[in-house]
Amino acid sequence: MIAANFLLNLFLYPILIKLFRRRRIGQYIRKEGPDLHGYKEGTPTMGGILFVLTGFLFGMISKTNTMVLLGMFLFFLIGFLDDFLSVARKDSTGLKTYQKALLQTLAAFIMLLLIRPDTNVDFFGSTIEMGKWYYLFALLVIVGSSNAMNLTDGLDGLAGWIYVSGSIPYWFFLKERGVSEDILLILGVGVLAFLVFNSKPAKIFMGDTGSITLGGVLGTVSVLTKTEFYLVLFFMIPVIETLSVILQVGSFKIFKRRIFKMSPLHHHFELIGWSEEKIVAVFTVFNLISSLVALEIFGVIG
């Protein structure tokens, strides 16, 4: 099934790229971004639609948890709407920031109402009872995961490789705990096929259709499996990218000074002269090492 999903995506992506080029479904580059990205304007976007839809298909075949599939669907709708508006308006805006945040919060709220999770958290082996505060915590985890992957999607291949380098070790970790969340692998191989066409120079971008969905799935899975804190160890790069934005905005508002040349962090490295390939390679290796160290610490390997 995993191999079939990979091959199906590998076969369909060239067709999708041709279709999107013909329909002029292309990326509009935001003006605030690095000048280096100007040549990417017009590259087909919304490529995440394929690995998400095949993820649904194989997820249903593998009898994936219904709540995970529902979460995937809700965040897919948000990402798709954002990309659709951007393409329709012929600019990079799509949904406004507050609109996207409201929709993500609503999606997470719906998920929590349906999941009705226990209100305790596993803090690396210690159980902490949070009571009603847990729902706010879980809301932040799901919305934060979705946004973190979205922020990471700024260079050719970056978000895809980060997802693969974290989701596969995370799957092994959950398997060791007796939890089967095969949707992580199903999406992972779909993303691998996508990366054949997304690595620099990218022939297609995943868009928010892909990145928001991937992050939403990760957050939902972590809440369902009570591994919210562990998730951070497998996705250190998205966490760092998010922190870089928070620090940059906070520093500028309070001290009128910027910490980085530009945020998220990958743009800072671009502006100090690193190539996209180098940034993607270094970030991916860092995330993979963090994931493998986590597996070693918790006795999954070694």
UniProtKB/Swiss-Prot annotation:
PROSITE patterns: MRAY_1, MRAY_2. Pathway: Cell wall biogenesis; peptidoglycan biosynthesis. InterPro entries: Glycosyl_transferase_4 (IPR000715), PNAcMuramoyl-5peptid_Trfase (IPR003524), PNAcMuramoyl-5peptid_Trfase_CS (IPR018480). One of its GO terms (molecular function) is phospho-N-acetylmuramoyl-pentapeptide-transferase activity. Its cofactor is Mg(2+). One of its GO terms (cellular component) is plasma membrane. The chain crosses the membrane at residues 1-21, 42-62, 67-87, 95-115, 123-143, 154-174, 178-198, 204-224, 229-249, 279-299. It is a multi-pass membrane protein. Its main location: membrane. The keyword Transmembrane helix applies. Keywords: Cell cycle, Cell division, Cell inner membrane, Cell membrane, Cell shape, Cell wall biogenesis/degradation, Magnesium, Membrane, Metal-binding, Peptidoglycan synthesis, Transferase, Transmembrane, Transmembrane helix. The keyword Cell inner membrane applies. It is found in: Cell inner membrane. GO terms for biological process: cell division; cell wall macromolecule biosynthetic process; cell wall organization; peptidoglycan biosynthetic process; regulation of cell shape. Its EC number is 2.7.8.13. Pfam families: Glycos_transf_4 (PF00953), MraY_sig1 (PF10555). It catalyses: UDP-N-acetyl-alpha-D-muramoyl-L-alanyl-gamma-D-glutamyl-meso-2,6-diaminopimeloyl-D-alanyl-D-alanine + di-trans,octa-cis-undecaprenyl phosphate = di-trans,octa-cis-undecaprenyl diphospho-N-acetyl-alpha-D-muramoyl-L-alanyl-D-glutamyl-meso-2,6-diaminopimeloyl-D-alanyl-D-alanine + UMP. HAMAP family: MraY (MF_00038). NCBIfam families: mraY (TIGR00445). Belongs to the glycosyltransferase 4 family. MraY subfamily. Catalyzes the initial step of the lipid cycle reactions in the biosynthesis of the cell wall peptidoglycan: transfers peptidoglycan precursor phospho-MurNAc-pentapeptide from UDP-MurNAc-pentapeptide onto the lipid carrier undecaprenyl phosphate, yielding undecaprenyl-pyrophosphoryl-MurNAc-pentapeptide, known as lipid I. This is Phospho-N-acetylmuramoyl-pentapeptide-transferase. It comes from Thermotoga maritima (strain ATCC 43589 / DSM 3109 / JCM 10099 / NBRC 100826 / MSB8). The lineage of its organism: Bacteria, Thermotogati, Thermotogota, Thermotogae, Thermotogales. The gene is mraY.
